[in-house]
Amino acid sequence: MTSQSPALLVLQHIACEPPAAYEDELLAWGARVHRVELDQGEPLPDWRAFAGIVAMGGPMGAYDDERLPWLAAEKQLIADAVRAGTPYWGVCLGAQLLAASLGGEVFTGAEPEVGLLPVLTTAEAAGDPVFALAPGRFSALQWHADTYALPPGAVQLARSAVYEQQAFAVGAAYGLQFHLEVPVWLAEQWAEVPAYAHSLQTLMGPDGLCRLIEQVRAYELETTRLARALFAAWLEHVVGLRVPDGKPPPERPRSVPGA
């Protein structure tokens, strides 16, 4: 890794859940992406070689170690890296893995949370270097049934009407239960994955696929703008990357009504 071109480690659990808008922002900062596709058996590298770690979502549970033995190694990497101060950005499963790695319980909740739904920031978010940019209420894509208990030392940053835990920070590590990064082209890809399509139709009804895609289409500009603004704040203030020459400051997102 060179000072001119910092590298971030991306832990990806399935091909159809890439960093999307987060990766767009990474590339805009001139960073290199080292992607590991864990579900394809790719080995974990030495985390010390990277300026930060981004862990994405997936259909598995953070507790599925017996079915997916590589999860234990991934959680150990996360625990070691985060305890050493390496910046971390976890999304959906990535947030649950962060909680589990640091001693929080991950478990199946009372009901699934699916669709474009309101998220509310906590009072603590106002003093956070990343979440201070978030409006008090914003819409985000939800698709999960598992949730987590905060690990020791964590600060809660967001909640929703369905689940108390939606975002948290532990030092330089952030976990976001929701998806802000998904553009409509990626939602359309999810609809082409049979297991994802079946899950949506089960949870949202026969027209679930169409409704989800249209929700993402309607809110894409707001959600991806917020994704990139929060991620840029993390890159600058937590990872410590230098803002690229000529890059405009992130636009402060406005509050939007829930879907």
Question: Model-flagged regions — what are they?
Answer:
Residues L180-V216:
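C-terminal helical/coil "lid" or tail adjacent to the Rossmann-like core of SAM-dependent
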Residues L102-L186:
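Pocket-forming structural segment of enzyme catalytic cores
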Residues A7, G85-P87, V155, A172:
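Short active-site oxyanion
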Residues A55-A125:
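Cysteine-nucleophile active-site neighborhood
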Residues M1-A84, Q201-A259:
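N-terminal beta1-alpha1 cap of cysteine-dependent amidohydrolase-like domains
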Residues E25-A28, P69-A73, V106-F107, A158-R159, ...:
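Glycine-rich, phosphate-binding/catalytic loops in enzymes
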Residues P19-A21, P45, D64-E66, L98-S101, ...:
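Short glycine-/acidic-enriched loop or helix-start segments at secondary-structure transitions
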